[in-house]
Amino acid sequence: MKVCIDAGHAKNTAGKRSPDGTLREYEFNRYVAKRLKYHLERHGVQTLYSCDIETDVDISLSERCALANSSGADVFVSIHANAHGNGAEWTSGNGWEIFIYKGSTKGKAIAEAIRKESISLLGLKDRGVKTDSLYVTGNTNMPAVLIEHGFYTHKEECAKLKDSAFREKCAIADAKGILAYLGIAWLDEKAESVNAPAKPSEDKYAELKSGFETMCKAMVSLGIYKNIKVE
């Protein structure tokens, strides 16, 4: 399975920042996109970005969709944070929501799966699954969703959007929802290490050392080696 991750906007995108200028949306989007990529890939899901997420230039929506359509991706997910008002002052608009293309049953299924995880993990107001004429959901060949992870024009939510722990929760919620849609069980990172080779314990090391010393002493006593020093 393959997921195309779209991190919305870039450094040169006009506006798209909190009223106090401490948060630019593209920075939040890219952080979550990278963590989403990590979590999907550790579950064996192939991923790609819809554009170079290190560039300062905002890649056009048509280019993003063209890349996704040529990639053979099974799911397209666009990462965003929301805004309300004129952007110059804090407003009361708040909450989490997700957009799909009208009539997309698969898009609806993905959105509901992500919504379930997000509302549980993030503690934000549930604004629900919505349909709108968004370019990226309407011009991609695969099921597509656009996620708004909270409002950077809302003072309290902006503080959350700047917090790395909250961003990680966003990525985990998105990943859990996508994986649920794909029929892949979520694995906590600690669970992944259960089957990792264990380091020899100190007792085992002492046991091996003692055995080696005994062997060396026996070889010396038999005259096989004369220059072995066993302390």
Segments (PLM) and residue ranges:
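Active-site-adjacent mobile loop/cap segments within catalytic or ligand-binding domains
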Residues: 4, 10-17, 71, 75-78, ...
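Short Gly/Pro-enriched loop/turn and capping motifs at secondary-structure junctions
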Residues: 104-106, 134-136, 151-154, 200, ...
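Short, charged, low-complexity patches
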Residues: 25, 29, 107, 111, ...
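Extracytoplasmic/secreted envelope proteins and their assembly/folding machinery
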Residues: 33, 37, 61-65, 73, ...
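Sec-exported extracytoplasmic/periplasmic mature domains
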Residues: 34-45, 69-73, 115-123, 175, ...
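Active-site-adjacent substrate-binding region
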Residues: 106-130
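Short, low-complexity, charged amphipathic interaction modules
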Residues: 196-231
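Catalytic-core regions of hydrolytic enzymes
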Residues: 1-96, 100-108
